Amino acid sequence: MRDELLNTPTDPLEEKFEEQIRPSRLEDFSGQQRLTDNLRIFIAAARQRGEALDHVLFSGPPGLGKTTLAHIIASELGGGLKITSGPLLDKPGNLAGLLTSLQKGDVLFIDEIHRLTPAVEEYLYSAMEDFRIDILLDSGPSARSVQLRLEPFTLVGATTRAGLLTSPLRARFGISNRLDYYSAELLQRIIIRTATILGIAIDQQAADEIARRSRGTPRIANRLLKRARDFTQVAQSSVISLELARKTLAALEIDEDGLDDMDKKIILSLLQKFDGGPVGISSLAVSVGEEHDTIEEVYEPYLIQTGFIARTPRGRVATKNAYRKFLGVLPGDDGPLFQKGSS
């Protein structure tokens, strides 16, 4: 369920939904206040100088707005936007075709930039630093290199795994920002904004309930809103009420902390199969039947943020919060945490 709620949309209808609700200006972007305030200054200064904006790196968990910010940057700069991802750029030739198609002031957005191959990454260095690339013509003894000048452009890179970026690539980004999880209050505002755009009536309490269970992530909040709309429509109601919101969340097995079935499997595996840890990520992944990359990128950041698991040099461990919520005991206790007569 979490992958479904977090994945970047590929279905045409889902893409249309994302485009419909996506803000096009920084002033309409909710959250990440310091980041957007700084970007506003950097963009204005670059436009006044008539220069390309320095290359921008966004890092952080999925669903927080990295792609949306790339769209906004292109819009604010008045340039075009080309979108690709690290896994798609498997050969330097693929990157060269993209780079040579860019016009002055355009933005190139590379999602999952940490997944670039070393050959493609090295090819990107001269493009980022000097706006040029070297094309190899022919092969063997007759091979020769031709240098092509590129129009000044801005590269926006996005990653959920900043630690996997090489130092040379990271150093070439003049602007680097990490996106943080959103507060429930901000998510509530986003839900109400999306509902207004889509023509959905929703109670304030219902919006708050969905916001609190959205894992601090706008993409999840918006998709849960869509599911609540479905339940409301089938119930032949004109308004998403608190009762219908809770019914939706219960059907999706999302609890009051925003945890879904896989989150619970991860925590219970830590507690029951590994005695609370520490345990390596590969062993934990095998125990729950999930890829370790997915656990690291999708599930683990929120579980750490909310204090249910912790990372140590020896592996992942369950926290007191996990013991309390799932077992009703604290580490080392012999009995239930809440017994009769306890104060």
From Swiss-Prot:
Q: Where does ATP bind?
A: I21, R22, G63, K66, T67, T68, E129, D130, F131, R172, Y182, R219
- Region span, Head domain (RuvB-H): 256-343
Spell out the NCBIfam families in the cross-references: PRK00080.1, ruvB
Drop me one GO molecular function for this one.
four-way junction helicase activity
InterPro entries in UniProt: AAA+_ATPase, AAA_lid_4, DNA_helicase_Holl-junc_RuvB, P-loop_NTPase, RuvB-like_N, RuvB_C, WH-like_DNA-bd_sf, WH_DNA-bd_sf
Subcellular compartments? Cytoplasm
Record family assignment: Belongs to the RuvB family.
Protein name, entry field: Holliday junction branch migration complex subunit RuvB
Q: Which domain of life is it from?
A: Bacteria
Q: What class of enzyme is it?
A: hydrolase
Coarse class of the protein's main subcellular location: cytoplasm
Task: Identify the coding gene.
Answer: ruvB
Please list the residues that bind DNA: R311, R316
Q: Which cysteines are joined by disulfide bonds?
A: none
